[in-house]
Amino acid sequence: MGRPPPCAIQPWILLLLFMGAWAGLTRAQGSKILEGRECIPHSQPWQAALFQGERLICGGVLVGDRWVLTAAHCKKQKYSVRLGDHSLQSRDQPEQEIQVAQSIQHPCYNNSNPEDHSHDIMLIRLQNSANLGDKVKPVQLANLCPKVGQKCIISGWGTVTSPQENFPNTLNCAEVKIYSQNKCERAYPGKITEGMVCAGSSNGADTCQGDSGGPLVCDGMLQGITSWGSDPCGKPEKPGVYTKICRYTTWIKKTMDNRD
């Protein structure tokens, strides 16, 4: 557990890229909660939102008083993190906005190829510590990998319709289940690594544009970071794909310990 997948790009992956086999997939920049509903306010106290000015770019997950996990493809030159938010149109009592001090992508993440979703994970170090409480608190990292069929919660401010985009004002939640690795690989042949996990539902509940970097939480433990999926979103046979946290716990903890 905690050992990341190998970094090397296999020759067959390069062949697939050359042949255009990645067409129809999207790395959701900023990725929605389809077939969900408004979350109970502050029921996801670890939920973070990444902003450039007033523009929402991605979700994130608070994992320490100065640390947020998100997707590596969400990295920007200058941006901030909002915590304790529910409605994006009004200021919530626990809401706090903190500037990003450092963005640390996984060392194996491939910035040069936007269609390579491997190792899509990044730690953000905040300039100041968050004020923690019942409505703003870190989530626990999963010690074990998720089980097939396990029920999980996804959340975000991403679009609630696809392919047409319609962004909600409030945080949305939906329930999904963990898919087997075989089912995941059948949905996306040749594109799933051991550092990814799929989750979805028969009604099409899914993450989408605006949700990238947000949490997949199962039994109160962080099991995934929203990474990529099909376009349009919400196809039951094409589940959302998440960076599998249990494969990166060693890197996460080591990175945080070395910079605290």
Swiss-Prot record:
Its main location: secreted. Its EC number is 3.4.21.118. Disulfide bonds join C39-C173, C58-C74, C145-C246, C152-C218, C184-C198, C208-C233. Glycans are attached at N110. Keywords: Cytoplasm, Disulfide bond, Glycoprotein, Hydrolase, Protease, Secreted, Serine protease, Signal, Zymogen. It comes from the Eukaryota. One of its GO terms (biological process) is response to wounding. GO terms for molecular function: peptidase activity; serine-type endopeptidase activity. SUPFAM superfamilies: Trypsin-like serine proteases. Strongly inhibited by diisopropyl fluorophosphate, leupeptin and (4-amidinophenyl)methanesulfonyl 1-fluoride. InterPro entries: Peptidase_S1_PA, Peptidase_S1_PA_chymotrypsin, Peptidase_S1A, Trypsin_dom, TRYPSIN_HIS, TRYPSIN_SER. Residues 1-28 form the signal peptide. Disruption phenotype: Mice display marked abnormalities of synapses and neurons in the CA1 subfield of the hippocampus with enlarged and elongated pyramidal cell soma and reduced asymmetrical synapse numbers. Mutants also display impaired spatial memory acquisition, increased hippocampal susceptibility to hyperexcitability in response to repetitive afferent stimulation and prolonged recovery of UV-irradiated skin. Belongs to the peptidase S1 family. Kallikrein subfamily. This is Kallikrein-8.
